[in-house]
Amino acid sequence: MGAARIAPGLALLLCCPVLSSAYALVDADDVMTKEEQIFLLHRAQAQCEKRLKEVLQRPADIMESDKGWASASTSGKPKKEKPSGKLHPESEEDKEVPTGSRPRGRPCLPEWDHILCWPLGAPGEVVAMPCPDYIYDFNHKGHAYRRCDRNGSWELVPGHNRTWANYSECVKFLTNETREREVFDRLGMIYTVGYSVSLASLTVAVLILAYFRRLHCTRNYIHMHLFLSFMLRAVSIFVKDAVLYSGTALDEAERLTEEELRAIAQAPPPPAAAAGYVGCRVAVTFFLYFLATNYYWILVEGLYLHSLIFMAFFSEKKYLWGFTVFGWGLPAIFVAVWVSVRATLANTGCWDLSSGNKKWIIQVPILASIVLNFILFINIVRVLATKLRETNAGRCDTRQQYRKLLKSTLVLMPLFGVHYIVFMATPYTEVSGTLWQVQMHYEMLFNSFQGFFVAIIYCFCNGEVQAEIKKSWSRWTLALDFKRKARSGSSSYSYGPMVSHTSVTNVGPRTGLGLPLSPRLLPAATTNGHPPLPGHTKSGSPALQATPPAVAAPKEDGFLNGSCSGLDEEACAPERPPVLLQEEWETVM
């Protein structure tokens, strides 16, 4: 009863951080292409020029102050301040004249400098504006600075015919230090190696489950769909990175300067639906679809295990079709809706960045699957604890009981994606320094290697899979040994650990070529001179008595192991749920 009472409260407590910051989990792969950066700069320029016209048409407002312009600025409210002398050294004249006694002449006119929309500037003051958020790689917590001289003109750079401005706080992210570069290189290596290892191991796991017919059952079909979703997610990430990250501003961060940003802004605006966007839009769409299908197949695994535990009558074939439509079809619906809305209402850029509230078309279904799957995980762990307590009711070794529960929980965590909630309460935008590095290394490691862990637990460490591989290996080595002995003409051959010294020539009848005659080619046994009916064997006949045990064993063995193939699947379907449930317990325990 204790575990049953604690589990719902624990689920509610842990679901709160899941809902609060799962947005960062889903939206963590945004990247700005150079074309999108140009588009955003031109859009900011158009908005600035429109508001400049509105302000310049009111001369009275210009002579009063910049209050009207401050409210119309697109980049936030400007602030007039005197920064430190290192960045903005004051002239001797400014130092001698107190601020309150300075003449209030004509202010500096607002203008667009191809990076930022500057408001009216009070004469003799330093104007500070927040770094624009439409430049993706800027430090959005910093400020850019300009000085308005006492004559109502923006201060010029000495020796150059251009306006002085200080963007050093904004571009500090564009001049990466060696240590920061090493961190990103290390994260990229973890990211690439993790998804590569997952992709390779999942491919082997799918081939194993598809090759052995005795492993063809509903449980393993669901595992194969889950493995395939992890594989497609990894492939889509590699394709998206190859398409988007080539030619981004981030790749040229160390060479990017303020002048180059102005040059980008002065370039002609790209068309809204350029042909160059087709490839990256397709890559982003498939990435979002396979990301959603991966989350939904993780949910299908939880629903299947939950159904085996709590449903008395469970029709596997009927639910398999439903699970397939749910795992692959439902994500296709809301991704298609998102594509239609984005193409109609926000057909700009490469579609990789969020566009207002339209992002929730994809994020809400994914968040719902994460929350539901976590609730299923808590409920299944509760049942595990109850089962272990009932099994060890007469024993006093509670330490072993808790050890088994911990092991079972750790096995279920990679499948249900429980590791996502560790840093759920600290989104990317709220961490920095050491904590940010710890979070990024943790998420890159577990997210990329999750497919590998799932393949290890549900394929390579599965007892049924290991038994089939051992049987296949024994048959293959036996066939090679038999062929080698037959070619050498030896009088002995081995069958596993048993050695027979029977002559090879006495093994069975031979054909005219000297090869052993297959039992299928031997004449059929006759009854009163007539061959028996197909499928009929007379009771007590030598044929019935001589039937090897291995001929009848597969059906019974398959029934006990829950791995039906062919006609056997129908025969053992009514009794399979308890058997399958026992197998799932064995896998988890």
From Swiss-Prot:
Residues 1-28 form the signal peptide. Residues 64-105, 524-549 are annotated as: Disordered. Glycans are attached at residues 151, 161, 166, 176. The modification Phosphothreonine is found at residue 547. GO terms for cellular component: plasma membrane. Keywords: Cell membrane, Disulfide bond, G-protein coupled receptor, Glycoprotein, Membrane, Phosphoprotein, Receptor, Signal, Transducer, Transmembrane, Transmembrane helix. It is found in: Cell membrane. The chain crosses the membrane at residues 189-209, 224-244, 295-315, 319-339, 361-381, 405-425, 440-460. Belongs to the G-protein coupled receptor 2 family. This is Parathyroid hormone/parathyroid hormone-related peptide receptor. It comes from Bos taurus.
